[in-house]
Amino acid sequence: MKKMKIFGFLISFSLFFLSPFVCQANYDSNFTRPPPRPLFIVSHGRPKFYPQQVHISLAGKDHMRVTYTTDDLNVASMVEYGKHPKKYDKKTAGESTSYTYFFYNSGKIHHVKIGPLKPNTKYYYRCGGHGDEFSFKTPPSKFPIEFAVAGDLGQTDWTVRTLDQIRKRDFDVFLLPGDLSYADTHQPLWDSFGRLLETLASTRPWMVTEGNHEIESFPTNDHISFKSYNARWLMPHAESLSHSNLYYSFDVAGVHTVMLGSYTPYESHSDQYHWLQADLRKVDRKKTPWLVVVMHTPWYSTNKAHYGEGEKMRSALESLLYRAQVDVVFAGHVHTYERFKPIYNKKADPCGPMYITIGDGGNREGLALRFKKPQSPLSEFRESSFGHGRLRIIDHKRAHWSWHRNNDEMSSIADEVSFESPRTSSHCHSNRYRGEI
């Protein structure tokens, strides 16, 4: 414990001098938030063969990927699972990877794809033949379905509060639009982050995309980026025919979700552009009536922090999303919450997606408090507070969105809206308003 306190102090000390700060002035809301919290370090304290940092993610139709780490390199990449506690009637082997960074060694990172699994069913599982028993519930195969959403998590007391509030109400899938651990090359922080979220991420699938804090260019001849992220957070890119772990898609219930990469090429000649174009063309709105997109850098924002950083990506990809009739676009990066009217090409458009910035998970850099004034008529609601969101898809036509502000022991609903998919509007469905993808 003493070593962990020293480690936490050294990390906090270095980050204090190396990290940018958000000026806490010109507050655009009447809700007052205390200063940012220090890092919340979670130690292991178990034998080396014990699985740790357990999390799950969707991995194609009726399958789940279980990821865990062991310090002992001899532990098998294997998951036992079944529908009853301590009774595992199935066992699946997987793969493993590892990486080094100067004197740091990641240990053995295991990825095991299990299934086929039944929808809306609780499974019990054990990793590597050792350690604790975990359990998860698979998402439903049809509506309703509920997503919990929070970006820019980090690992502070505010992160803990956000995760606690999310845990209080059930959900089916967690969406994280980038900036996970805020390790920023301090590799032990990846381990601490994995331990911090294990109690939640081992029970429901976490679907994530990368942010700028995941870039972590390694000081090698080839300057590899995203090495830690790609090793630890293997998403279903192969299952969605993407050649990169930085962008992919997945289906759950009646929702097709596309996770885009803000920090990998997206221009019209890029692999990501061609993959996105092909992916959207294959969407069958009879099978997946809802279409959701998640990315890190917002295309629309009225906050002064990172203003305009998503403009090039918007110019390259927005028309694809519009023609595909995307319903909702989530982003992070700006440490605030903001919800826009349906937009296309910087104008209100009832056939465009509803854009939501939700980079308020609890990161160490604090909140982005400086909004542009007066408030744009396109911006429906904005507030600089930590919290999380809930997207509940009720049926093929109706959905409900709510944003839950972290308020001491309670998680109060500060913003909510019920809406219908633009796809169901005869005006928006007309080919007169849509071109080919």
Swiss-Prot record:
N-terminal signal peptide: 1-25
Binding-site residues for substrate, renumbered to this chain: 212, 333-335
Cofactor: Fe cation; Zn(2+)
Tissue: Expressed flowers and siliques.
Residues the record marks as active site: 306
InterPro entries in the record: Calcineurin-like_PHP_ApaH, Metallo-depent_PP-like, MPP_PAP, PPA-like, Purple_acid_Pase-like_N, Purple_acid_Pase_N, Purple_acid_PPase_C_dom
A Pfam family the protein falls into: Pur_ac_phosph_N
Reaction catalysed by this enzyme: a phosphate monoester + H2O = an alcohol + phosphate
Annotated positions binding Fe cation: 152, 179, 182, 335
An example Gene Ontology CC term for this record: extracellular region
Localization (cell): Secreted
Chain residues that bind Zn(2+): 179, 212, 296, 333
Keyword terms, alphabetized: Glycoprotein, Hydrolase, Iron, Metal-binding, Secreted, Signal, Zinc
Cofactor note: Binds 1 Fe cation per subunit.
UniProt record similarity statement: Belongs to the metallophosphoesterase superfamily. Purple acid phosphatase family.
Subunit details: Homodimer.
Protein name listed in UniProt: Purple acid phosphatase 21
Lineage, highest ranks first: Eukaryota, Viridiplantae, Streptophyta, Embryophyta, Tracheophyta
